[in-house]
Each structure stands twice: as structure tokens, then as C-alpha cells.
Amino acid sequence: MQGLLRQLYCAAVATVIAQPAWANAVYVSNEKDNTVTIIDSDTMEPVKTINVGQRPRGITVSRDGKFLYVCASDDDTVEIIDTATHEIVGSLPSGPDPELFVLSPDGKTLYVANEDDNLVTVIDVEQKTVLAEIPVGVEPEGMGISPDGKTMVNTSETTNMAHFIDTTSHEIVSNVLVDARPRFAQFKPDGSEVWVSAEIGGTVSVINNATREVKHKISFEIQGLRSEAIQPVGVRITADGKKAYVALGPANRVAVVNAETYEVEKYVLVGQRVWQLAFTPDGKYVISTNGLSNDITFIDTQSDEPVKSVTVGALPWGVTVAPN
């Protein structure tokens, strides 16, 4: 009897001290606060704040959802956070000033853009070791990877190029010139195209992944706004490859683009200085980080209307959502 009571007591204590689990938790990096805000995507309410390293920017969740990776840019490291306990449990050797990164489809390799050193650092996530350092253009930032994991794309902001890198040899195999200050690279789900945003150029270049040539350039025009105020940054493409969302920076809008015709269909007004985007796993919402209004916006992907804005920390930048 005493043994049974002891087991029940231990179970009760474990229940009390265990962290609550939120379905499809949204993680937002706040670069001024040095925090990550967790939002429950079902209730669209913030539930917890985690203290992290200095100037957090890039953020992503491991494929199994057990760990959160955060670029602590001014600490020159990538921090590892346990998504069950929300404690920092380790770090990865990222190289100096990690800005953005991308995880391989199998979740085993992390590719990190090191803006200060003009490098892409390749990290074995499990072993926590550097596999390679790849020299790229000046001020690398945007990172994308093909669905088959064979090709990684890095954008260099000052060189104005998209570098296509073979993930086996870790060699650059193609350089594609794009417009000024490319900030993000996103593959279509079928791997046929890479979309590269140009913040100062005001365009998104659509690159054919087979020929490594720009096949189309998407430009944006918003009544009442100067062209210089429209600065494309984050890009996301729906799972069916039919629609894309582009964050337009100080234009305070997200552009909705037909990903088959490349026509802009709508501009969605969100918070101030929109940076990055992420889909919920079910694809029902795309979430924007709004840096100067210190909030995020949930956008319904059926109506392409904003549903709710949620206050987070100071200067939200990156966003990711835990898988189902």
C-alpha cells in the first residue's frame, strides 16, 4: 500500500511541476529584449517568455519538435532550448554573428549564415560540431534549402547574389545576381524555384532551380507609399505551391502573391516594420513579426485577412511554429 501511495504521490508531483504543453506553439525572437515569446496558436495568447542570449534573430524548431534553436547573434552562438522545460540545454558552434539558418530536411544538419565573417557554417546538430565553413559573398543572411536536401541557397546582402551550394561537397555551384540587398531565400515545395527577396531593390526574384537563372521578378506597388518604403524581406510559400506571402518591411504589409502567375493579389495591413513569416502546421494561418509595433499578426490564409495581433517582446524579428 505504501508503495502504491508513493507512486501516486510522485505522479502528482510530476504533474504539478511539468510544464504545460501547447499545441502548435508559436515561438517569436525579440531582439531588443533578448527573449523568446511563446504563443498558444489555438488561443492566440502569449503563455510564456524565455530569456535567451543577446540579439536573438533566426529561430527554428527541430523536426521532432523537441528542441528550439535560436541565433543569439551578439553572443556568436546558437542556443538550444528544450521545448518541454523551456530551459537552455546547450549551444551549437555557430561562428560569429549568426543571423539566419536553415535546417536540413532530415533535421541532422544546420546551415548558419555568419554575417560578420562572410561564411556559411555547417553544423552537425547531434554531435554539435562544425562540418564545414563555406566562404560566400559579403554579409550573408538569407538561407534556404531544397526539399530533397541536396541544394542550399545563401543570399549575400552586399554582393547582391544568391549562392547555390551543393550540400554534399559544400561547394558553391552557381552564383545568381539578384537585386539590391537580398534578405531571404525560399524554395517552392516541389523544389522547382527559389524565391529571393531584395530589400532595397524592392523585388522578389524567382529563380529556376534547374537552370539557375532568374525567370521572373515580382515588384510591388502600394497606393500612397513611396517605392523606397516597400522593402521585401521574409517569404513563405504554401504547401501546394500556389500562393506566396511576402513581408514588406516598413510598408507594414504582407503581399499575397499568386505563385503560379506571379501576380500580386492583395496587400494585408499588419503591424509596423514586418520582418518574418511562418505558417501554422495546418496551413490555416500565416504569422508575421512586426518589429516596431512589438507584436505579431495572425493572417487567415483562406480569406487573407488579419485575424488577431498579439503583443510580444521588444523588436520581434524571427518566428517559427512547432510541428504537430
Where are the regions a protein language model picked out?
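Bacterial N-terminal signal peptides that target proteins for export
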Residues: 1-9
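Predominantly soluble domains enriched in secretory-pathway, periplasmic, or organellar proteins
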Residues: 12, 16-324
